[in-house]
Amino acid sequence: MQSCTINVCPQNKCPLLIDVLFFYVCSVDHEVAGKDVVFLLDGSDNTRNGFAAMRDFVQRMVEELNVGENNDRVSVVQYGRDAEAHFYLNTYTTKDDILNTVRGLRHRGGRPLNTGSALKYVRDNVFTAASGSRRQEGIPQLLIVLSGGRSSDNVDIPASALKDNGVLILGIGTRNSSTEVQRIASDPSYAQSVSDFSDLPNVQHPFASSLSHVVVGVKPMTPTVRGKTLLLISTQIMLYLLVPSCT
């Protein structure tokens, strides 16, 4: 955490800023009890050499979560031409079970890469009550997309549908897919680019921070603070996001 020289939060209720995705979030002193986190992994032919790094990234991220039926739930979906869930949000209730399954994930392969269809798949089959989603209970919904190439189908419509359903989308793309991942993400600043997936450890910390301090429903606010844009994040807790960072 890092303290700002000024308190940008209203009524002096949250003096600390938390590093999240290379900007800072000012949070109140309580957090959401749980969240539903879905990892969508590019398993196409393009990522054959990078899939082990993606798998390791998911393991490290899960280690940061407070997994439990009434806490954090996790699902992993792999896609190429088609999408397939390795497990759903209500499949496992312990961190050990999730980690053991993730360690055993194998690259599926396939072409072409249909990221749009995969986004529709997670909306229709994973972020549902039957699959363990608690969206209707007000639990934050997060989707983390890892993509290694440009999609052969449209990504804008299914990504918008997820956002309209209250899903916060974060993304990591390689240089071939970075612009597309920015369009998929809930905000372009929620997307990161790596030269290849072996660089995923370099972005692990900010993404882990984002899982600890969930934000949903971003919209701009005025005025600015010291020339920086103040954004309001709406969820079960109130968070304020300062872009790019406090110095």
Question: Where are the model-predicted features located?
Answer:
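DG-centered beta-turn motif at the end of beta-strands
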Residues: L41-G43, M54, V76-Y79, V122, ...
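Intrinsic disorder/low-complexity segments
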Residues: P15-V20, I233
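C-terminal helix of von Willebrand factor
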Residues: F23-S27, N114, S177-V225
